[in-house]
Amino acid sequence: MIKSFNEIIMKVKSKEMKKVAVAVAQDEPVLEAVRDAKKNGIADAILVGDHDEIVSIALKIGMDVNDFEIVNEPNVKKAALKAVELVSTGKADMVMKGLVNTATFLRSVLNKEVGLRTGKTMSHVAVFETEKFDRLLFLTDVAFNTYPELKEKIDIVNNSVKVAHAIGIENPKVAPICAVEVINPKMPSTLDAAMLSKMSDRGQIKGCVVDGPLALDIALSEEAAHHKGVTGEVAGKADIFLMPNIETGNVMYKTLTYTTDSKNGGILVGTSAPVVLTSRADSHETKMNSIALAALVAGNK
């Protein structure tokens, strides 16, 4: 089973190279990531944006623009829409946000004519490689859905399972994270967790095992699960951590990022093609890992 981003990248390189359309590509950190992604055999790219600005940045960072197709579109909104259209028409396999605000970019992703909407809930999946655990940790949703209800959580679980399957985890273990591991009518997230677990038992959620509610320590650690007397397929062995809300997810994401020696990458899924939506605060390595993750999911339709 794949346990690291190096292994993810090796798996991506063993397949046909995918192509990412970069929306408003005149962004130095994004161009550096795209340059190195192609150099390392992870993904090719189509750069959509202001041609002259792209070339100027490319010269600054030692990037040979002749290695990439550039679509000149100085208008930010039109460039974002064009990048998405390249994916929906099959000329690229995934789309990546460049120097454009998130709201404008997502409006293009959800455009009724050329967008990537599927009718399902879009969600963000962050994948972490840590020294402490012998498996990859999938966090969802840490960036997109604020207070998902049961219907959205079903889609969020299915989206994350799709990513896990692409990586090679055949039957991922999903833990709906709550403050406690018992059902409490005053804590709605525990009720959702119980319903998701029963749906998994009945085969309504497929390709994974869902068991909850589970507190974070019990989902992560077999030792903690043993001490608290919690048993089951997921306790202490969870792959996917379903967050009850965006605050919990965002705090956990940033805690792992800034206080542990970890690596991560993340993508938006629930769309007809993967969406790379990184933050300017994300490291170069995180951007590269996110492109690799998107390429792997794009190749596993």
UniProtKB/Swiss-Prot annotation:
<dbReference type="InterPro" id="IPR014079">
    <property type="entry name" value="Phosphate_butyryltransferase"/>
</dbReference>
<protein>
    <recommendedName>
        <fullName>Phosphate butyryltransferase</fullName>
        <ecNumber>2.3.1.19</ecNumber>
    </recommendedName>
</protein>
<dbReference type="Pfam" id="PF01515">
    <property type="entry name" value="PTA_PTB"/>
</dbReference>
<comment type="pathway">
    <text>Lipid metabolism; butanoate metabolism.</text>
</comment>
<dbReference type="InterPro" id="IPR012147">
    <property type="entry name" value="P_Ac_Bu_trans"/>
</dbReference>
<dbReference type="InterPro" id="IPR002505">
    <property type="entry name" value="PTA_PTB"/>
</dbReference>
<keyword id="KW-0012">Acyltransferase</keyword>
<comment type="function">
    <text>Catalyzes the conversion of butyryl-CoA through butyryl phosphate to butyrate.</text>
</comment>
<dbReference type="GO" id="GO:0019605">
    <property type="term" value="P:butyrate metabolic process"/>
</dbReference>
<comment type="similarity">
    <text>Belongs to the phosphate acetyltransferase and butyryltransferase family.</text>
</comment>
<dbReference type="InterPro" id="IPR050500">
    <property type="entry name" value="Phos_Acetyltrans/Butyryltrans"/>
</dbReference>
<keyword id="KW-0808">Transferase</keyword>
<dbReference type="GO" id="GO:0050182">
    <property type="term" value="F:phosphate butyryltransferase activity"/>
</dbReference>
